[in-house]
Each structure stands twice: as C-alpha cells, then as structure tokens.
C-alpha cells in the first residue's frame, strides 16, 4: 500500500500525462468532437485502479460520442501510460464524465434567480410601506 502522499503525486502525474495524450496522442476523431479536459484522477491506494474524471464541453451528442471514443481508447491510454510513467504495474484506467462544473453553474444560476426575486419582493414591500393610507 502506497502512502497518501505518493498516491497523490502519482495521480497528479497520471493526470498530466493523460491531458497531454488528449491533446496530441489519441487519434480517434470522436475524442476531438467535444473539448475535453481531465478534472481529477482518483487512484486506489495500491496504485492498481485509476478513475479518470473528464469534463466535456459541447452538446449532449458530442459528450456521448467523446465518452465512446475515450472508452475505445482505454487500451491505448493504459499502454502509453505504462511507457510514460515508471510503475511496477500500470493501473487499470476507467474514464468517467465529471459534471460537477455543470451542476455548479446550475446552482449559481438558481442562487442568482432567488436573489433577484428577493430584491423584487423587498422593493415591492418598500413601495407598499411608502404609500400613504387614505
């Protein structure tokens, strides 16, 4: 079992290498259909399994196509990772779509809408309080 510090260092190295592969190494056109970036790598304590979280910018169809391309390129990515990173055993690689940025944007828009509604209600309350009673 590797130490937490080593796991974090290896995960960061894997993230950097896979990001470079996405930019220049993977020839599958499906991977290029949406703008892809590696957001996180979750590496198991024994360094045998790596979950690669990717953020894909584009339409829903482009996202599905890009994920299919990444799943098809998993073998190549693992092989190339074995050449680039010196480990006793190359970890099994699984690509997962990270939608946290999208969810964060939705939450922010909801908060902004609530803030606007509260401001409107406060303005209406002030106007009602200022009206002279007849």
Swiss-Prot record:
Q: Note the subunit structure.
A: Monomer. Binds 30S ribosomal subunits, but not 50S ribosomal subunits or 70S ribosomes.
- The answer, when asked if Cytoplasm is one of the entry's keywords, is yes
MF annotations from Gene Ontology: ribosomal small subunit binding
User: Would you name any one GO CC term?
Assistant: cytosol
**Family the entry assigns:** Belongs to the RbfA family.
List, alphabetically, the NCBIfam families matched. Answer: rbfA (TIGR00082)
Q: What is its main location?
A: cytoplasm
Indicate whether Coiled coil appears among the record's keywords: no
Q: Which InterPro entries match?
A: KH_dom-like_a/b, RbfA, RbfA_dom_sf, Ribosome-bd_factorA_CS
What this protein is reported to do is described as: One of several proteins that assist in the late maturation steps of the functional core of the 30S ribosomal subunit. Associates with free 30S ribosomal subunits (but not with 30S subunits that are part of 70S ribosomes or polysomes). Required for efficient processing of 16S rRNA. May interact with the 5'-terminal helix region of 16S rRNA.
Task: Name the source organism.
Answer: Cyanothece sp. (strain PCC 7425 / ATCC 29141)
* Cell compartments where the protein resides: Cytoplasm
- HAMAP family named among the record's database cross-references: RbfA (MF_00003)
Gene name of this polypeptide: rbfA
In the record, biological process GO terms are: maturation of SSU-rRNA
Please give the PROSITE patterns that the UniProt record associates with this protein: RBFA (PS01319)
Report keywords, A-Z: Cytoplasm, Ribosome biogenesis
Q: What is this protein called?
A: Ribosome-binding factor A
